[in-house]
Amino acid sequence: MLNVNFVNEESSTNQGLVVFIDEQLKLDSNLIGLDQQHHGLISKTIQNKLQFTGKYGQIKVIPSVIKSGEVRYLIIAGLGNEEKLTEAKIEELGGKILQHATGCKISTIGLKLTNRISRFTSQTFASLVASGAFLASYRFDKYRTTLKEAEKFAVESIEIFTDNSTETAKLFEIKKLIAEAVFFTRDISNEPSNIKTPQVYAERIVDRLEPLGVDVDVIGEREMKNLGMGALLGVGQGSQNESKLVVMEYKGGSKDAPTIALVGKGVIFDTGGISLKPSSDMHLMRYDMGGSAAVVGTIIAVAGQKLPINIVGVVGLVENMPSGNAQRPGDVVTTMSGQTAEVLNTDAEGRLVLADAVWYAQEKFKPKCVIDVATLTGAITIALGNTYAGCFSNNDELADKLIKVGEEVNEKLWRMPLHDEYDAMINSDIADMANIGNVPRAAGSCIAAHFIKRFIKDGVDWAHLDIAGVANSNKASALGPKGAVGYGVRLLEKFIKEYT
């Protein structure tokens, strides 16, 4: 794991030294001495716009001209226009710095802060850069037995020179705790589905959360049957692995304080069931539990900080498998709410899991607000691509707050419509509703949201986040490698912290 340290005095023991330059290409007063020490290497570089323009995110790694000393490389990082810098951009810049240092096999890095930024304190700037670097240090390679030497290399430490190391370290400790929650979400999402069975996943939740003071209850199929959870159980009935409902309760607030419920879809592997998916990308369905992982990660972050709020998480863990005992297209299931659903397509299974999970959360905990998170529909990816998750809500204020926070942490949300005409499209001839719409390929993500909405009680504020397009990525980003992104943890943690 990357070591991050904050020190008041500059050290010369790091192999790489990072300096920040904005698009005005002017040396900070605190860089003049360093530039002279390195025989004008920094000033010569920024005077040549073919080499360096100062635009945001540009990283220039230059071998040091000093024969003696530990510093082998100067790393010049572009800030761009200071007025356009955001916290998210500063974090991503930290990630880019770490990635370039890794590529150049620089094992220890020192960061010299700029004094040209007025919109952020030096402590905030330093903690954000460190947070981005820490997030970018994540790896999931435990099943690789033949890593090449270049693939094994990792930056060992980052040392940031700041005038208030104690205060900066406190800020970073919170960000590190949140990043470690993101790492749990990434880890469990990346885990192969033959390893993370519902039972194993549930055990990992217990092991991670109980030491943080979170009450965790793992409900098996017998109890779910007694509760009337026919929708969730129907999805998992084709699998040899027993379905689980994991209930997490963190009581940090007063007894009369309102409760927020987070509900996550945890389809451990989704073949589509009898309505079988195409085989080409089916291996990616190990990520179909990304919503549940985001819920668990959020509770790790909240409980780890001991925030004074009451929050519950409910995740339905199932496998959607074809077998002689699998659910059939045309089956009718009775949900915990008593409403019935005709299963016209067994590959529209996530909404069935959520139907019972959100109802359970409302019945048991009487929350003021329910936010469900799910890799629910391919339709949302067609609509929004891999940049935005879809946000559906019955409350404008709730939706606006989520969208605002999403912009701030760069986990973006786009408000999607709810409408009575969409709701009418899930009416069934033989049951209370069908799990797909009656117009083929029309408004798929909206239809799915309306299915869940039928299980939200009157007076409960509700938001549904369809994260199918953003939960995993086929390419690396500034904050992590390809694979599971950990989307939703930082969004929900900040939403809960700021608005409850």
From Swiss-Prot:
* GO MF entry, a single one: manganese ion binding
| Cofactor, free-text remark | Binds 2 manganese ions per subunit.
Q: Where on this chain does Mn(2+) 2 bind?
A: 265, 270, 288, 349
Q: Where in the cell is it found?
A: Cytoplasm
NAD as UniProt keyword: no
- Alphabetical list of Pfam families matching this protein: Peptidase_M17, Peptidase_M17_N
Query: Where does this protein chiefly localize?
Result: cytoplasm
Tell me what reaction this enzyme catalyses: Release of an N-terminal amino acid, Xaa-|-Yaa-, in which Xaa is preferably Leu, but may be other amino acids including Pro although not Arg or Lys, and Yaa may be Pro. Amino acid amides and methyl esters are also readily hydrolyzed, but rates on arylamides are exceedingly low; Release of an N-terminal amino acid, preferentially leucine, but not glutamic or aspartic acids
Per UniProt, Mn(2+) 1 binds at 270, 347, 349
GO CC annotation: what is one?
cytoplasm
Keyword Lipoprotein listed? The answer is no
Per UniProt, the keywords (alphabetical) are:
Aminopeptidase, Cytoplasm, Hydrolase, Manganese, Metal-binding, Protease
Q: What is its EC number?
A: 3.4.11.1, 3.4.11.10
In terms of CDD domains, this protein maps to: Peptidase_M17
Q: Which cofactor does it need?
A: Mn(2+)
**Catalytic residues identified in the record:** 277, 351
**GO terms (BP aspect):** proteolysis
- Protein family per UniProt: Belongs to the peptidase M17 family.
Give the function comment from the record.
Presumably involved in the processing and regular turnover of intracellular proteins. Catalyzes the removal of unsubstituted N-terminal amino acids from various peptides.
Protein name per the record: Probable cytosol aminopeptidase
